[in-house]
Amino acid sequence: LFGTKWAPTAADPSYGILYIILTSIIGTAVSILIGVPIALLTAVFLTEVSNKKLSAVVQPAVELLAAIPSVIYGLLGLMILNPVLYKLEKHVFANSATHQFTGGSNLLAAIIVLAIMILPTVINMSVSSIQAVPQQMRAASLALGATKIQTIFKVTVPAAKSGIMTG
């Protein structure tokens, strides 16, 4: 089962799924490394930087994105992202004699789709956690001479870290 050879139709079938498992782990980890910082910075922007009007427009849009089924994200990735990545792949590997073209369906496409899929959930959890930080902590930081950016990244985000990590 944890072998590296996948030959289910051979005379002596082999069902090694080690590469499939490793690819899933790598794809998930990289999509988290891409998606979480983007989502956290978006949540900081929505709660600490933007005006109320913009937040009132963007927040429902983020919640709407959270309601989209994962199958739809996958379909959009297949229909939109794969052709773009295939063109990029043809351009990058134009002179390669050994490259097997994937048609755009590759780990990069999966990572991008997964990173987009986790954005709404992480944004919503981060917004809730940042809003739960007491206003007195922000006021104390500003009273001690910290700038707004320093207050956000040295006081507010660390105070909200446990709630953000839960999401």
Would you name each region that the model predicts?
Residues 1-30, 51, 100:
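Periplasmic/extracellular loop-to-transmembrane helix junction in inner-membrane transport proteins
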Residues 31-62:
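Transmembrane-helix boundary motif in ABC transporter permease subunits
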Residues 64, 122-126, 148-167:
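Transmembrane alpha-helices
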Residues 65-111:
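Generic hydrophobic transmembrane alpha-helix motif, especially the helices
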Residues 69, 144-145, 158:
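Glycine/proline-centered hinge or cleavage motifs at structural transition points of membrane proteins
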Residues 126-139, 147:
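Membrane-helix/interface signature in polytopic inner-membrane proteins
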